[in-house]
């Protein structure tokens, strides 16, 4: 964690930027690819000095929270730095996001759910960090190994039978090598 002074365009003024832990961060876990997506929120949050409370979806409480907590515990994470609350979102979700303790609520999911969560989090003016479905792009540049790039594009598109929000939906090929890229891989 650090701070810095950033150059300001206004004479005789300075802009300061401070990075510091927020305290407790609430993470709402997903059902699909839950281990990876949940730890992607937890690991950096803990590394920056925050405590985490995770509410895994009731469909995947083990891979979306309990197993991750066990891994961190075995790695030596101090007690109470990572907590898991298991239950149906319909029963505990409102209380989880409107609770006054979390300084930040992290959620990856649909637009409708984000809107509902933002309204509930606003009760305590909690900060929110929402990640929606993205459109991952497979980028192929002139120095790429084309055989490997084609393989990576196919794997990226077909991984998890396309049920993952990170599945490749677009392939961008640098114009100078476009004609060298096998057309069949573009159909995937």
Where are these regions (language model features)?
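Beta-loop-alpha module in the N-terminal Rossmann-like domain of NAD(P)-dependent dehydrogenases
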Residues: 25, 32, 88-95, 109-116
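ALDH superfamily catalytic-core signature
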Residues: 112-188
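A structured beta-alpha segment of the ubiquitous adenosine-cofactor-binding alpha/beta core
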Residues: 14-15, 83-106
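N-terminal Rossmann NAD(P)-binding subdomain characteristic of aldehyde/semialdehyde dehydrogenases
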Residues: 1-42, 75-77, 82
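PLP-dependent aminotransferase-like
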Residues: 38-93
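General beta-strand structural signal in soluble alpha/beta enzymes
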Residues: 54, 84-86, 107-109, 128-132
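Thr-Gly-centered strand-to-loop micro-motif
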Residues: 28, 48, 54-55, 107, ...
């Amino acid at each position: 964690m650090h701070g810095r002074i950033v150059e300001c365009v206004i004479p005789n003024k300075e802009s300061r930027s401070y990075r510091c832990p927020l305290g407790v961060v609430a993470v709402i876990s997903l059902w699909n690819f839950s281990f990876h997506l949940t730890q992607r929120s937890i690991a950096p949050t803990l590394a920056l000095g925050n405590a985490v409370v995770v509410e895994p979806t009731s469909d995947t409480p083990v891979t979306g929270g309990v197993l991750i907590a066990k891994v961190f515990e075995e790695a030596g994470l101090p007690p109470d730095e990572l907590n898991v609350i298991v239950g149906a979102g319909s029963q505990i979700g409102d209380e989880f996001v409107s609770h006054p303790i979390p300084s930040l609520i992290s959620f990856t999911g649909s637009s409708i759910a984000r809107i509902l969560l933002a309204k509930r989090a606003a009760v305590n003016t909690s900060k929110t960090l929402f990640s929606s479905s993205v459109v991952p792009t497979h980028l192929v540049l002139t120095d790429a190994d084309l055989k490997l790039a084609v393989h990576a594009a196919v794997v990226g598109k077909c991984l998890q039978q396309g049920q993952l929000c990170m599945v490749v939906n677009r392939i961008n090929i640098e114009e100078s090598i476009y004609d060298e890229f096998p057309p069949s891989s573009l159909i995937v």
